[in-house]
């Protein structure tokens, strides 16, 4: 690794500032999904075991920066963490002027976005945060693509900055899949829009043997192949771009199995009847909401040959049971595969949970935007600053 990891750093009697991703759903003052909190436990526990004091920072939701708003308070998260780790967790509402914490203790700071200057990573705020600790640990991959005070600025000004256990595992899994994949490699890119994933598709073309498109993205590719998509979600202005990607894939020998059959409906509704049709038969008043059984079989066959699988996005509107078959079949193909598999993004995680394949995916990334930017080949500011600090 080109940056320091938690295990490279002396933590005894040190105040350790940890940027975690505790942006979790809270309803009626209770945390409703603890996945992200649980993911941070190994880092927190390691610091405590090494004799350090833990100061946790995170954002929650999108409050107006610089203003306190009780609905975005991290106090319920501190309580949830205390229950999970079975230790007291102090809560610091006003923390920028100093945090009272001793070795073996945990403090959860209030939402970083209540501080003016967080998003722009102002020097004043960054220096103030850095002065609270001796060591900074970045463990929130989900925010690594943002150069903010609690992810980037603090690392710049604190004496020692390193990656936490979760972040280290995340980068290792993604690098294994993207930089040194065992071939053949397959990538699944689904979701509603080509525009948000265009650079991902282009970047992956040079790395994969199989590129599977799904959701609204697939509709744009179906249109690029000359078929009408009726009332389906697609992007007319990107049809030419999709045509170029298909041509480039052909030249590179990359297989893009554009759906040959689909499940359509007359309306976008949970109760709509799913009708299976060839792509050439989609009527003007119909919308494509899932891939069809023939397309499922083609994908399953292709994935059997893969040694590395990267998955971002569903292939249909899996939230509606009538249009979940394609994503379910894809999930089961990945679950049954011997390949090293990495999955990421909110919808992908929801699909993994819905179809119960969590234990069959090699690595599940909790990140959304950062996961996509990594797939695009972009540099992530919060990772880059850790690399710079390691050289100094």
From Swiss-Prot:
Q: Which gene encodes it?
A: pgk
Quick one: which residues bind substrate? Answer: 21-23, 36, 59-62, 113, 146
- Species of origin reads Francisella tularensis subsp. novicida (strain U112)
Q: Which GO terms describe its biological process?
A: gluconeogenesis; glycolytic process
A Pfam family: PGK
User: What binding partners and quaternary form does the record give?
Assistant: Monomer.
Q: Specify where it is mainly localized.
A: cytoplasm
Q: Which GO terms describe its cellular component?
A: cytosol
Q: Which cysteines are joined by disulfide bonds?
A: none
- Catalysed reactions, semicolon-separated: (2R)-3-phosphoglycerate + ATP = (2R)-3-phospho-glyceroyl phosphate + ADP
What Gene Ontology molecular-function terms does this entry list? ADP binding; ATP binding; phosphoglycerate kinase activity
Which parts of the sequence bind ATP?
A: 197, 319, 345-348
Q: What is this protein called?
A: Phosphoglycerate kinase
Cite the PROSITE patterns for this sequence.
PGLYCERATE_KINASE (PS00111)
Q: Which UniProt keywords apply?
A: ATP-binding, Cytoplasm, Glycolysis, Kinase, Nucleotide-binding, Transferase
